[in-house]
């Protein structure tokens, strides 16, 4: 029997949902009643005699997450991280845009610039995302407080289970990222930058961050499964451009005698410079190394945007 056929025939999830909702005074109507009341903050009340416990959500949003989780797991057999759902304001969503959803981040002028750009765009259009979710463990979803109850159900299913499953199961996210590590890494990086600003001065740190930002898209640590010898017969980019006359200055510099450098297979420029630059102070090496890890974390998100929205 195909997996699709098994999904179509599987009705056990309905029994699980019934068993869950049977503990509440509104029962199955709890979602329709919230729609009619036009609020996702609709009260969910347990029936008399039902003792509160961790398996019975005490908020409407929590109950939506629980029901969606039953459908995701029992009907579609989706593997996901645990969820954290936060209901946020428009101002908080603009902040999330600026930090790409990360709950902690260091300070830099470029983030303030992005924040102003997003705010101006919002004032013109009054449009913001219904949700943002980040690849972390637990997965953190930010849902707009202006969402209607039905939209809240949709975005929780979409973000907290659709995107969540993609983050957990897609091979690029498995190979390039550690979902449990990104929030602690971001916190450690923020704290390190703050301490360095106090010890070495904001200007010195800012100049380093400017350089790191310029190299971020060229700082991807390739996993072992792609670090392979070039197959015989495969055309490299440099072969395509062989014979092209380059500028004299470039040729003169490129052909200048010097000590050969063994780059190995390291493709993360930030990490390579941090490890090999001869006169770099240790605090700069540490920041560059951590920035290289953050850059690698965002790589699969750029590569899978269409597929992730599936």
Language-model-detected regions and their locations in the chain:
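Post-HExxH zinc-binding segment in Zn-dependent metallohydrolases
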Residues: 164-231, 310
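Auxiliary, metal-adjacent structural segments of Zn-dependent hydrolase domains
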Residues: 18, 40-44, 51, 58-139, ...
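Catalytic glutamate of the conserved HExxH
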Residues: 155, 159-164
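Fold-level signature of zinc-dependent metallopeptidase catalytic domains
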Residues: 52-60, 143-146, 166, 175-184, ...
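Short pre-active-site segment immediately N-terminal to the catalytic Zn-binding motif
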Residues: 138-155, 298-306
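Charge-rich, solvent-exposed alpha-helical interaction surfaces
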Residues: 13-23, 27-30, 63-66, 70, ...
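Pan-zinc metallopeptidase signature
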Residues: 24-45, 210-310
